[in-house]
């Protein structure tokens, strides 16, 4: 599997990182992403780079970011559907950033999406679109549209 382009990821992340109200919420998102990144038993270099980029864009200092790898915490509930969709997409990007998609990651991301209250049919469809995409990146507008369609 091809690696995701980190420059393109940075551009996408810049579009989807906004909207987190408190530092505690941003840390919670990053903790969830760190836990997801090591679900296959190891942290790949590209996953580490990706997480570092996310931390930077969330305004989390490097020392605090590194300390998060030694913390365990239940993620805070994400209040708005838009923010839950953003977090789902960040996790999906993280799943593909190392060029490998493990079965454990597929199962975990589906459960996380259900726990966040996202429609399982839509999340499966988005993951299928990402799987079929050469770059593994789907425009955020297309993802939002998929979730809007479920409400109609």
Please report, for each region that a protein language model flagged, where it lies by residue.
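Small-residue-enriched hydrophobic alpha-helices in membranes
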Residues: 1-36, 42-152
């Amino acid at each position: 599997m091809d690696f995701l382009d980190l420059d393109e990821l940075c551009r996408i992340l810049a579009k989807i990182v906004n909207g987190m109200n408190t530092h505690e919420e941003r840390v919670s998102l990053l903790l969830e992403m760190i836990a997801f990144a090591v679900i296959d038993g190891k942290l790949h270099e590209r996953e580490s780079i990706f997480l570092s980029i996310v931390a930077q864009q969330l305004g989390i200092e490097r020392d605090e970011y590194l300390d998060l790898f030694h913390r365990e915490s239940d993620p805070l509930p994400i209040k708005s559907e838009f923010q839950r969709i953003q977090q789902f997409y960040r996790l999906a990007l993280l799943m593909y950033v190392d060029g490998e998609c493990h079965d454990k990651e597929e199962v975990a991301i589906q459960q996380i999406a259900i726990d966040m209250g996202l429609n399982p049919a839509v999340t499966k469809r988005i993951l299928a679109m990402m799987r079929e995409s050469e770059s593994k990146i789907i425009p955020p507008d297309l993802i939002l549209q998929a979730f809007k369609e479920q409400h109609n």
